[in-house]
UniProtKB/Swiss-Prot annotation:
The EC number(s) this enzyme carries: 3.1.4.11
Residues in PI-PLC X-box domain copies: 163-307
Provenance organism: Mus musculus (Mouse)
Span of domain EF-hand: 43-78
Top-level EC class as recorded in UniProt: hydrolase
Location of the PI-PLC Y-box domain: 386-502
GO biological process, one term: lipid catabolic process
Effect annotated for changing residue 378 to E: Abolishes nuclear translocation
Protein name: 1-phosphatidylinositol 4,5-bisphosphate phosphodiesterase zeta-1
Residue span(s) of domain C2: 502-627
Amino acid sequence: MESQLHELAEARWFLSKVQDDFRGGKINVEITHKLLEKLDFPCHFAHVKHIFKENDRQNQGRITIEEFRAIYRCIVHREEITEIFNTYTENRKILSENSLIEFLTQEQYEMEIDHSDSVEIINKYEPIEEVKGERQMSIEGFARYMFSSECLLFKENCKTVYQDMNHPLSDYFISSSHNTYLISDQILGPSDIWGYVSALVKGCRCLEIDCWDGSQNEPIVYHGYTFTSKLLFKTVVQAINKYAFVTSDYPVVLSLENHCSPGQQEVMASILQSTFGDFLLSDMLEEFPDTLPSPEALKFKILVKNRKVGTLSETHERIGTDKSGQVLEWKEVIYEDGDEDSGMDPETWDVFLSRIKEEREADPSTLSGIAGVKKRKRKMKIAMALSDLVIYTKAEKFRNFQYSRVYQQFNETNSIGESRARKLSKLRVHEFIFHTAAFITRVYPKMMRADSSNFNPQEFWNVGCQMVALNFQTPGLPMDLQNGKFLDNGGSGYILKPDILRDTTLGFNPNEPEYDDHPVTLTIRIISGIQLPVSSSSNTPDIVVIIEVYGVPNDHVKQQTRVVKNNAFSPKWNETFTFLIQVPELALIRFVVETQQGLLSGNELLGQYTLPVLCMNKGYRRVPLFSKSGANLEPSSLFIYVWYFRE
């Protein structure tokens, strides 16, 4: 009897929602599409057309209310959702409050759930008032809950800034872009303000500005010696000022590639000061005279990264003085060992360092006399006004690890090209991690990438490089990893590096085949696909799901499902995969949906989603999908089950 009452209540509710649209008798496919949205179940029009055609029995392009209900049930009352619902109900019609709590604790691992939480879920998602009033949930409410943001794969607490933000800047991975002003290739592509706006909205915290002398004493931004278009420096700065803290409160670093004359450098300094005002960091913080401040201490601050002459104390003493026309000579004395990248065992390295220190104390000018050390000089004129705006991010050429350990100051940052960084990460891994534990290190794409392609950033995160700069305008795997990694910590653009990359006494080596420190065993069941994107080449694509793990080399693995033929609307797999992840703190997981097109043409990417392994919820979860360009493809998603434990 109770079951029949609930069925009647559900029928009355459904009729009340749709009957007005059927006053004319039948509806077409466009109204069907809108009505599904009205019922809180938006659907891709391509899928609506397909299901509409299957249910239009008379092939008139119009359907009855019964035919619409069949379409609605096909979309909402999915078999895999109904099976879960039935497992926790006695009559397969209604989920009690206690049964909902049982489901949430046993299946979703919501261990702190209580009656007030379950009532809140019922009130939020149950659309049938009679059922809601009894603190129960129908399949309608349960389906709405399972398809809601609360059941997404990404952990809710990872959507907030939950990490300790009081460590020095060098203790964080920092979301960084390369050639931010470009929105295409590096030879003919246009420069555009949108490059900066888009990067900042995505949470990027380090922007590159390539500055050159312009006409009428107006510095310009473009990729020098190419045919890329030009932007006014002041226009770029104004855009940054508007969007700098829209997504994140934490500091923005402006990495200046400065090719300007002293006169136009002075103009740059004036523009920076007048535009940013108090947001521009122009003096050291009192509590951080000789150590890097934290992101928390630098909230809402703009930092300038550029060459600098003199010390922070000298800069402090000049505050308030007139610097017009004053030019400083920047000198770079480069000491290089003969074979920079050759391996050096720790004992030999310590002897080498001791020798440098002894020579330095005795007579700095004799350093070049050490066997194997070469010396050369470089000079450049810098406007004092611009030099004095560089505080905690002084650009300093990277010579080698030995030199940095002896000479490098706490506020000096290095930029290393990808090829050299890759070589160092393989041959000098311990020294590299020791270096990045102390100094901010930026890795940038090699010059040969004229098409603005990117490298895999994971290999440099593995050795602690803070600023792994990518071409944000170029979609693909590297940017998927970038976007996925920086979803963490509230999308703030700052992620605290794990202990193994901050504490050098741990002796971490990402290249070791095994790292026995509480690995994670991860099990994922790919259950089904929900309204997957339609292929550009076929309305009935053959779908495959690929799971990829990126992290230290030993954790890099790829597994895939079987191919489901001719079904993008609701393909089903029910396939289980297990992964052993040695260093989960550095691991990202990527879900890829492709359509199989044959050996010659290759697979077509339909959607993907990347996130940190430790940001995954357990239980039945929905994986949102994003296009190659990063567009959200909702309601396209995967329905999966996740379980993992740490040894």
